[in-house]
Design a protein with these regions (language model features):
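Class I S-adenosyl-L-methionine
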Residues: 1-222
Length: 222
């Protein structure tokens, strides 16, 4: 059985965070708008009609990235459990990938329960697996429902914390702060926004927007 590995990240996030990643597309059972599968061997992209190629999928053009994610996938598909590093304080589950079945989702719920001092969070379109365990999620595991999947109707029905991707800050509703480093994804019960295809200048734009959000001086949007 392949040995899975976390990636230690010292930039982008607030503080040191370990990422656990799986291959795009192949581990996305309920994706719709971002359903992009990358062949493990060739790196060839298979983009479903109407889908867009996200950052996570684009990274898999590199063989080392593909192999790393597929080894993780091999591990958990065969009922393996990731070994959390000893110095880990925070885990971002799936910068790439999603909960591909109920058993795998339940594994992360149990890992969170077994490690109550480790902060864990994830975006997901696998909403049925979450709803099936909605009263069993520990406080240190924060989940965010990502709009644009095949089960969006479950978000409002079960009042799930959620995120919507927008093309411009102007389109973002007043009540949604914009996340650019996962800070809002790590907070429970707050719905937020992401910007699509954000450029290098995104941080200053998002910072200005969130400053306005915090002090109540948001600019008007139609």
């Amino acid at each position: 059985m392949s040995e899975g590995k976390f990636i230690k990240k010292k930039t982008y996030y607030t503080g040191v965070v370990y990422e656990w990643n799986l291959p795009t597309g192949s581990s996305y059972p309920f994706a719709l708008e971002c359903k992009v599968t990358v062949d493990r061997i060739s790196g060839k992209f298979d983009v479903e009609k109407g889908a867009y190629r996200c950052y996570a999928a684009s990274a898999e053009r590199f063989p080392a990235v593909r192999e790393h994610r597929w080894k993780n996938f091999d591990l958990v598909k065969n009922s393996g459990v990731p070994t959390i590093p000893n110095d880990c304080k925070a885990i971002r589950i799936h910068m790439s990938g999603d909960f591909f079945n109920q058993k795998y989702f339940d594994m992360w719920v149990q890992l969170a329960k077994d490690n109550p001092n480790i902060e864990m969070w994830a975006y997901t379109k696998s909403l049925q697996y979450w709803v099936n365990r909605i009263n069993d999620i520990p406080e240190n595991l924060v989940l965010t429902a990502s709009y644009g999947g095949r089960q969006d109707e479950l978000i409002e029905r079960h009042n799930l914390k959620n995120v919507i991707v927008y093309k411009s800050p102007i389109l973002v509703p007043k009540e949604r702060p914009i996340d650019n480093n996962d800070d809002w994804a790590r907070k429970p019960n707050i719905n937020f926004a992401l910007l699509d295809n954000m450029k290098v200048s995104k941080k200053s734009a998002v910072a200005d927007f969130n400053k306005s959000f915090s002090n109540g001086t948001l600019f008007e949007r139609e």
